[in-house]
Amino acid sequence: MADEFFHAGKENCSEQARRSQVSGPRSQFQRSFIQRVTLLGKLPTRFVLHRERKQKVAAILGVDQEAMKSLPEGDLDHCLLSKVDLRRQQISQTMEEVQKIIHLLTTEISRQDSRFEAVPVSDTHNESIKVLAPSLFHVTVPLKGLAGYKGVQRQRWRYYNVQGAKLTCPLRDPEGLQQWLETEMFMKTLWQWHKADVNIEGDIVPAKVLQVFRTLVENAVRTCHLSGKVTVLEKRTTVWVAMETSTGQVELELAPTVEIPTTWPEKAQWPRCLKRWPSPERVECIKSFGFNLVAQSAYHWQLSFSQAEQVLFEQLDEDGGCRRQCFQVLRQLKEDVWCPGRRPVITTHHLQTVLFWTCEKYPHLKDWQVFHQALLRLVRKLHRCVSQHFLKHYFVPKSNLLQSANPSELDAVAQKVAFFLKNPQVELP
């Protein structure tokens, strides 16, 4: 049944990509598609481990080998992934609380300023909230009133600062995942996007959007009587809040985001030539989800492919491989052993990118049938990236995701991962 659904999903997704001509709010089809593939991804799966592999897998995960010998074959997956399951339960509880507060805040923000859209509550996967670490979340707050993305930019120099004053030297051009955002790049715009509180010389300036948004967040915290539960953090270039939950304090980055569905940016030269993964049909489906532009810097908007990445991740193991299980164990090792802490230098998004590059290099099912070999392959890839301080973005390879990371923190992680590779026996806390 799952195969039938994904086959139908690919056909429907391809048809959606052909028919959609105008950018605007993300379609109901795309939202429901993401929720359905996520729900399928959470269904119980059998993780088959042959008896002769027990000791190797136990050594990798630090599980007591004698205890494993006494376990029935069907209970091995539960034993090995028990830490992963515990994490999932804790994150689920935290996510439920975070969603409710974020929905409450953004509903009030949207009431105050119609350019900002409320973040909905979801029973399955919330496409607006991404877990970077157990106590670190990234929340995209959709912006309204920008529809019909054309993507045509005027070639011109910009001589202004955030205050609107004239500069003697032009601003630098965007690099990597960055780009300008002009009102003329859309077929339809609300008149509020032309106001001086966010617009300079026709550009929608992310720093000014963040200034407006920060004030709205502070007002919403007071209006919703959440001052004892939510704190807006100071001295941050973007908007961060600390939130008290039943599992402890978490930090969230609230990022105003322009959603651009059905359009694929020129900077994303994907798929690459002569690559067998993913399939052409899957590529067409994924690209139909488009991309986002996120306010995270002063003058340039940041390209984000969160929806495309989510769909790609959820459909990894249709062939029965163990890619996602390997990723979950890799993430657990990262969070518990190699890179713990509230604001880790390596996040879940970095690990997901490592997984995508490895899947592209090893596209066949045979490469993802032996768990311990597949896991160590991922660990080696992670070690190379961290030790070299270089991890290419999967869709925009010219961008290094570790460029702004702390070098000494990366070196410390690389040392721990190298130690694991020499002696892959780790006791998870």
From Swiss-Prot:
Basic and acidic residues bias (residue ranges): 1-18
InterPro entries: Mab-21-like_nuc_Trfase, Mab-21_HhH/H2TH-like, MAB21L/cGLR
A family per Pfam: Mab-21
Residue segments, region Disordered: 1-25
Family: Belongs to the mab-21 family.
Protein name: Protein mab-21-like 3
Organism whose genome encodes this protein: Mus musculus
Gene: Mab21L3
